[in-house]
Amino acid sequence: MAAKKVYLSPSTQQANLFVVGGITEEQNSNLVTDILEKALRNKYGITVYRNSPSMNLSQIIADSNVKAPDIHVAIHSNAGGGRGCEVYAYLISGKVTNSQKLAQYIYNEFSIITPSADRGIKNGITANFGEVINTTATAVLVEMAFHDNPDDTAWLIANRQACSTAFEKAICSYFGIAYIPDPLPVSTDYEKLNREAQSQIASLQSQLTTINQELTAEKDKYNKLVASIKALIS
């Protein structure tokens, strides 16, 4: 089977400042995309294309259409006073489009991890999102959460890995690929491990010292008792 091709399009909106954290929508979306791109390439052999922060919308659409990916995923965060995730898809009345299927997979994964109620799958055509309308690939635009809400913003900053994993799982589901979990992290903080080991050794040594002292005291009591018995007998 030919390798799947994905175009990742993190936000290029440099002026959209997060309400906390001193970071922009563009920066955060790219940090999530960095993790996602690595996972798709290394774990599944997916061909990943990506926009550049210097591109404008027309250039992004043109670049995606030239690359001809299977899917185009625009990764954004939202503003306007709300909370939660919403996904924009190419919706056609009376028909379930591939864009809608992809949007549903992504929305399902984000609904599990977001800290508030989410906002549903919406029509990217009526919203006039060029990346949904004018790309030739199956396309969605994802608003992960609201960067003008303090709680959503803090969540976005703290959960980039979780957001990437949500995209990864959804893309796997759409392509019919088995999701591969990341291995559990192995500690490489040898100094910390050594400190913990030394602490445990010291604790055991202290317990042994206490036991020896108690045994010595019991032995002394026994010897005195034996001496008393001998004195009585004699």
Regions found by a protein language model. Give the residues of each.
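Active-site histidine-acidic residue metal-binding/catalytic motifs
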Residues: M1-I60
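Loop/turn elements at helix/coil->beta-strand transitions in domains of secreted/extracellular proteins
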Residues: A2-K5, K43-T47, K67-H72, I113-A117, ...
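Active-site-adjacent mobile loop/cap segments within catalytic or ligand-binding domains
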Residues: K4-S9, Q13-F18, H72-G82, G120-P183
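A short, glycine/acidic-enriched catalytic loop
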Residues: A15-E25, N78-Y105, E109
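Long, well-ordered alpha-helical scaffolding segments within enzyme catalytic domains
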Residues: L31-A39, T97-P115, T153-P181
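Mature extracellular/periplasmic domains of secretome proteins
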Residues: S58-P69, F129-T135
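Extended alpha-helical stalk/coiled-coil segments
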Residues: P185-A231
